[in-house]
Amino acid sequence: MFITSPLEQFELNNYFGFYLFNYHFDFSNFGFYLGLSALIAISLAIINLTPYGSGAKIVPQKFGIAMEAIYFTMLNLVENQIHSSKTVSGQSYFPFIWSLFVLILFSNLLRLIPYGYATTAQLIFTLGLSISILIGATILGLQQHKAKVFGLFLPSGTPTPLIPLLVLIEFVSYIARGLSLGIRLGANIIAGHLTMSILGGLIFTFMGLNLITFIIGFLPITVLVAISLLEFGIAFIQAYVFAILTCGFINDSLNLH
């Protein structure tokens, strides 16, 4: 089956469906790749505890070193970005940030497999994540500081006549931060996928014209390979950016700044 449209790769395709307690459930390519991302992340964590990783070894193998590097990178991120409050330790949120990071990371990496599905290209998914994080951070702030959390919407030293306007601006900005968190991730993944798909299709068509264009076509293939390597780096960067901005939301709720 050939993909005739660059946007066709983002379509949801149901594999099968079933009824449970009078509710209909569908298992689609989105659910498959999202579940596969979670399964790979869990499997790598378990493997890292075995002799093939860093478990039971004073000097871990390359796989263990790579896993430890990612682990301590995220641990340092949480320690630097989420400052402990009087009642809550910032490190207590590390499991959540780590799980969020590896899920997005492997979701981004699986899309680089030919004909793979990009779960993070679904804006409903990325926006759902970001809005859930925003709501959770807001509830955390209310739990820790009660009504004082609304001080986030009122900068100190604001003249009384400007209070309604600035509160509205800060509130809209607060909501926009949550929306932009998901839109940024989804837009970058969509743009990268479309670039590789369109460029790959043009090269394939060009090389199929005749023998001369077939030989010349190997030159733009190097550009496509370079873009693929760039997308590999973007997969890590976008997961890291999502994690660091999530840390910012949590820190603002804990410390009101």
Curated annotation (Swiss-Prot):
GO cellular component: matrix side of mitochondrial inner membrane; proton-transporting ATP synthase complex
Primary location class: mitochondrion
Gene Ontology biological process terms from the UniProt entry: proton motive force-driven ATP synthesis; proton motive force-driven mitochondrial ATP synthesis
Cystine residue pairs: none
Subunit structure and binding partners: F-type ATPases have 2 components, CF(1) - the catalytic core - and CF(0) - the membrane proton channel. CF(1) has five subunits: alpha(3), beta(3), gamma(1), delta(1), epsilon(1). CF(0) has three main subunits: a, b and c.
Localisation per UniProt entry: Mitochondrion inner membrane
Annotated protein name in UniProt: ATP synthase subunit a
Function: Mitochondrial membrane ATP synthase (F(1)F(0) ATP synthase or Complex V) produces ATP from ADP in the presence of a proton gradient across the membrane which is generated by electron transport complexes of the respiratory chain. F-type ATPases consist of two structural domains, F(1) - containing the extramembraneous catalytic core and F(0) - containing the membrane proton channel, linked together by a central stalk and a peripheral stalk. During catalysis, ATP synthesis in the catalytic domain of F(1) is coupled via a rotary mechanism of the central stalk subunits to proton translocation.
Ion transport as UniProt keyword: yes
Family: Belongs to the ATPase A chain family.
